[in-house]
Amino acid sequence: MTHAPTPPAASNFLRPIIEDDLQANRFQGKLWAGKPGPAALQAQGQPDPARIRTRFPPEPNGYLHIGHAKSICVNFGLARDYGGVCHLRFDDTNPEKEEQEYVDAIIEAVHWLGFDWQADGNDNLYFASDYFEFMYEFAEALVQAGHAYVDEQSAEEIRASRGTLTEPGTDSPWRDRPADESLLRLREMRDGKHPDGSLVLRARIDMASPNINLRDPVMYRVRHATHHRTGNAWCIYPMYSWAHPVEDALEGITHSICTLEFEDQRPFYDWILARLAELGKLARPLPHQYEFARLNLTYVVTSKRKLLQLVREGYVDGWDDPRMPTLFGLRRRGYTPSSIRLFCDRTAVSKSDSRIDYSLLEQAVRDDLDPVAPRSVAVLDPLKLVITNHPEGRSETCSAPRNPHDPQAGVREFPFTRELWIEQDDFREEPPKKYFRLFPGNTVRLKYGYVVRCTGFTKDESGKVVEVQAEYLPDTKSGTPGADSVKVKGNITWVSAAHAVPAQVHLYDRLFADAHPDGGDKDFLACLNPNSKQTVQAWLEPGIEAVPGATWQFERLGYFTVDSKDSRPEAPVLNRIVTLRDSWQAA
């Protein structure tokens, strides 16, 4: 059913526009026949149950990325907040680049992000290709009304005649051909009688317009290509600038929300809708286009061409590589749908281009996971610690909260034994100033366990420390009376060497070391971060169930998730989602 109005989560420049439209009853009397269609069909409909209609219109020629997530959240979020409906529409007007694989992936990604398009008994999943017959019918009507003509100039000639920002264009020699002659040529184009690029249908507007987009823009081109849905039924395909307003109007869209690069196209958008409404082809009220700044992140590229190059040339391990900005990459990295929605909600919807710092995305997933992620311990760079006065073969139980934010989550238990694994960084033979962890003679607390005093260490032939020895103080076990009688400045994490679970851990970081890898004339490949992926053999706290998608906060280290692709029950593979705090330093 249609979403009930809910208080908006955040403000942006589109909200006052929608609120003014609703207050002015701009859409009062708007009819909806239960499916998209022209004016004649909608006239048979009922009052539209949706207060507003928006749409997310991806082209099925690639995988969705974090920039698309912003548009998804804006369009679905506004529909939700104002008692409306958001359509998912595939803009499949370019058959040579589109595939069913991408359609399926986009549907999966939008669902994963937490949005649905069903409402009032309608699926609201649409394809531009469903409207090809309407578009062609409308094109003929425009030709007959003198608003369009078939041009036989080459693409180069059309480009040359367009003029410049300071000089008007020149009329095509075919601009004033009789309407019936253009109609005949258009039908020949439709019937496949002309080769690719030989003829185009152009709108007849104004070759002297200061807006180059109104200098008789192309509406249809000949393209003998197989479409992933319509097969070979069509050999002419609409240009996006012609298809876009028609699709919006057929679907009863009220607020067509685009990114800023379409701002200059809005006059043509309005022109198309006005002419077709005058001809009785489209129902009023007509859609209106609004533009907002696309989401640009530092340390990220979202160009499909560049992302494809990264995949094809092996710089990443596919479209779902956890370093990729694709939604599937973020999902595999361990980002939750709610964390991405939170990030999008925290970024402004404005008319001004800007770059959002990547750290805001990382902070969103921290804020999302912190209240819910169970705690555990992992040792990523292990060093053996032997408690020399602890009996061999003896195992004690220590306990810790599963989640300090949720007392109902209970406690977890794990063994304390003579031999432990600690982090290499938690020992120094010669400590620097203000180093409070293990070094000869120093005392620290093994978190949730005992206070220990370092008594020695062992090196291998290369001089590397391979083992540390310590004695524990039996009366200092955490959670027991008198445990705090010995004051220490350092706490370190540990796992039992005999019980820890071995795992491969991928330490992911930003894919690019340059904040603006696609800026200016840079070679974006030269900006890659050589340390964006490091793999270590780690030891995990026993009791961890390494099922795909499971997520933990490993204390002192960050948030980690089980890899959905490579992990196996007998050989866990984990991905670092994000560190506990922002400590980024460019390579």
Swiss-Prot record:
InterPro entries hit by this protein: aa-tRNA-synth_I_CS, Gln-tRNA-synth, Gln/Glu-tRNA_Ligase, Gln_tRNA_ligase_bac, Glu/Gln-tRNA-synth, Glu/Gln-tRNA-synth_Ib_cat-dom, Glu/Gln-tRNA-synth_Ib_codon-bd, Rbsml_bL25/Gln-tRNA_synth_N
Protein name per Swiss-Prot or TrEMBL: Glutamine--tRNA ligase
Chief location: cytoplasm
Catalytic activity: tRNA(Gln) + L-glutamine + ATP = L-glutaminyl-tRNA(Gln) + AMP + diphosphate
Gene (UniProt): glnS
PROSITE patterns: AA_TRNA_LIGASE_I
Residues reported to bind ATP: 59-61, 65-71, 259, 294-295
Subunit structure as annotated in this protein's UniProt entry: Monomer.
Motif 'KMSKS' region positions after renumbering to this chain: 301-305
Annotated compartments: Cytoplasm
PANTHER family for this protein: GLUTAMATE--TRNA LIGASE (PTHR43097:SF5), GLUTAMINE-TRNA LIGASE (PTHR43097)
